[in-house]
Amino acid sequence: MYQNPSAIPPSFTDPKMLKTHIATQIYAKICFNTTSGQKKIIESLSEYLAESDPAAIFVLNGYAGTGKTTLIAALVGALKDCGIKPVLLAPTGRAAKVLSRYSGEPALTIHKRIYRQRTNADYESKFSLNINQERGAVFIVDEASMLANGSSDGAIFGSGALLDDLVSYVRGGRDCRLILVGDDAQLPPIGADYSPALDPKALSVYGEVIYTSLDEVVRQEAESGILFNATLVRCMLENGICEVPRFRMDFPDIEAVEGGEFMEKLQDCYDRYGRDETIVITRSNKRANRYNDGIRRYVLGAEEEIESGDLLMVVKNNYHFTERTEDCPMNFLANGDIAELRRLRRFEDFYGFRFATAVLSFADYNDAELECKILLDTIASESPSLTREESNRLFCEVEKDYLDIKSKLKRFKEIRENPHFNAVQVKFAYAVTCHKAQGGQWRAVFIDRCLRRRADDARHAALALYGADPCDRQTLSGEFR
């Protein structure tokens, strides 16, 4: 299990002594008194690492404010001190960046780690499951509530079932372990009623599951209005209370913002924290479009439809341009990735759609730049991305350029190489929907009041609250009328 033999204490051949040693190392990394719940988790983790079958899956379901982040950071440090390699993964680039920030170690997206591009890929599948060459490593996956066991991209990635592929990849190594970390109060994967990666019953198909849960808010966070209200909403969900969420506002890190104050407050947060650390979270793409339009026009002073410096969000996975860019740090552009528009080269009208050639910079990938075609039609669309009908129309129009190719297979391959057909679908990223915000963390979060108008809004409200960084005592989590 140990990567560094010199780190193995000679007297710790006994698993029970090894368990004690690991627990001691974890406690040493935590600079405050642990809660009873944290102590139980530390004991369970230590036992899992020292005594359990490596094929067992460990689940840590941690409520907001319970010290889950601190615990994982301590675990990562303890593993390194014990000579055990931690491998940190998250579903999205933004979530990986958050994980890396609090753990102090590099983190990758799951897709970047477990899949590799096929050198002779056919037109239907481009990425196969990579080979896990690790020995005795511990894979820690944060934001596991986002993990689906199906894909809208079919079998472009491995089997098309991300959770299956993740488990298979980890077990493909020698004596590697898998720890899934998340919060089941957050939104499940799109189209799912629950989060399979945090559900012991769903995970039992893979074998032994060790399920643990943190539910005691740590003393340091007791005065956080963000966490108080997140806990309040969680209690509503757990007890089946179907009512409109009502936030308590008498805390220093949360306030109500009247409609007439919104633009001024937003500008203040842009000045204080930066645009990439400030977000508006709302329910629908229609509402997000309205906010993005107003923010660009009245706060940022934008005059054009799209301008250099705009923040954009990728709204549909895209594989075309990363494959054709040398040394690109991203396997693909993921739905939810945020980029700054550095340069606009030209606008084009083709196939009944509008495009632009752009250079995008991705902060979550060390400001890596990528030149690509972007599709402008999705910016103001009220659908999450191109509708099925629009996608079919684009395909049919592009196909007309290749009708001289008689073979349908060859023609389809040529269409898939067309940069306009593969244009990156984007929206503005100043205001986003709850699903798009999941896994991210910002220093200033504005919550649209529409998230508290219906009795079924509790889970959406919880997700919006989780987007605010409770460790930042200056965080503003606002709602506006």
Predicted segment positions?
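Pre-P-loop entry segment of helicase/translocase ATPase cores
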Residues: 2-8, 12-51, 55-56
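Conserved helicase motor core of P-loop NTPases
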Residues: 11, 18-23, 41-45, 53, ...
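Conserved SAM-binding loop
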Residues: 34, 88, 280
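Short, conserved phosphate/pyrophosphate- and ester-handling motifs at nucleotide-, phospho-/glycolipid
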Residues: 38, 92, 284, 439
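ASCE P-loop NTPase helicase motor core
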Residues: 42-43, 47, 52-249
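Catalytic phosphate/metal-binding cores of nucleic-acid and nucleotide-processing enzymes, i.e., regions
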Residues: 55, 93, 346, 427, ...
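Short, solvent-exposed amphipathic alpha-helical segments in soluble enzyme
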Residues: 104, 295-299, 462-466
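C-terminal accessory regions
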Residues: 350-481
